[in-house]
């Protein structure tokens, strides 16, 4: 087995297979779940809008894939909803069966210097999740732009109780980058807390993913590359990785 094949298998196991499109419907969510080829590899989670959590759960159960987590998003994508709405969204999503909540911080408030607002959104969302759901915190690194703000947002997410810190919504001009990833991982490492990392948006090929795996190993060590601490948020990546794995089986 080549190194590329091993990496491809690892990438699938770390993936949040994602569909967050405005025209999503039950059929598209079923198609998303049906794109999983159990023989080639099973992702860690699927990520869908809250109203499709139940559809995703049923589709996974029909494929005997109930162990795959279902994630959803809150305060998405602009980070501008009032806190009470965000908490309501969170509780409804958990009632629908969401295992993981990907919260967008009010990053525009952070750019204005309102760190306390960000901390409140994270800590209150964490309380709403309780022990029922993991909290992944999206800092929208491509909009924060500066290393100082990216590090600060990561610190606030950790302080608020995030289980993972995630780069991006995938809905802005600049999404996951290796530069932002390096800052975020070093900030997580410095905290000495067991916080995971998720790269989302722009990771489209096995080659793209491999660059993130290499950087993460250098900073956090091999053991960090497990679904409990590392994820890729992606849609088209699965097809590319399956292609690599399919060719390896020929």
Where do the PLM segments sit?
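N-terminal beta-loop-helix "entrance" segment that forms/cooperates
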Residues: 240
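Terminal helix/beta-alpha structural elements that buttress the NAD(P)+-binding lobe
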Residues: 200
């Amino acid at each position: 087995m080549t190194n590329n094949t091993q990496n491809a298998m690892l990438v699938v196991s770390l993936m949040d297979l994602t569909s967050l499109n405005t025209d999503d419907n039950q059929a598209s969510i079923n198609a998303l779940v049906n794109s999983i080829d159990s023989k080639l590899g099973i992702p860690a989670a699927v990520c869908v809008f809250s109203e499709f959590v139940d559809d995703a759960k049923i589709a996974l159960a029909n494929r005997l894939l109930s162990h795959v987590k279902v994630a959803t998003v809150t305060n998405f994508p602009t980070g501008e909803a009032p806190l009470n709405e965000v908490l309501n969204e969170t509780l409804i999503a958990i009632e629908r069966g969401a295992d993981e909540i990907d919260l967008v911080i009010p990053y525009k408030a952070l750019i204005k210097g309102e760190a306390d607002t960000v901390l409140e959104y994270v800590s209150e969302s964490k309380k709403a999740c309780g022990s029922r759901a993991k909290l992944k915190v999206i800092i929208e690194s491509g909009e924060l732009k500066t290393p100082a703000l990216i590090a600060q947002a990561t610190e606030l997410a950790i302080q608020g109780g995030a289980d993972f810190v995630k780069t991006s919504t995938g809905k802005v001009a600049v999404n996951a980058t290796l530069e932002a990833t390096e800052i975020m991982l070093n900030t997580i490492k410095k905290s000495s807390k067991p916080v995971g990392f998720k790269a989302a948006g722009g990771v489209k090929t096995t080659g793209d993913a491999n660059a993130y795996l290499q950087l993460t190993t250098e900073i956090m060590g091999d053991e960090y590359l497990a679904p409990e601490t590392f994820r890729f948020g992606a849609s088209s990546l699965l097809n590319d990785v399956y292609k690599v794995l399919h060719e390896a089986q020929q």
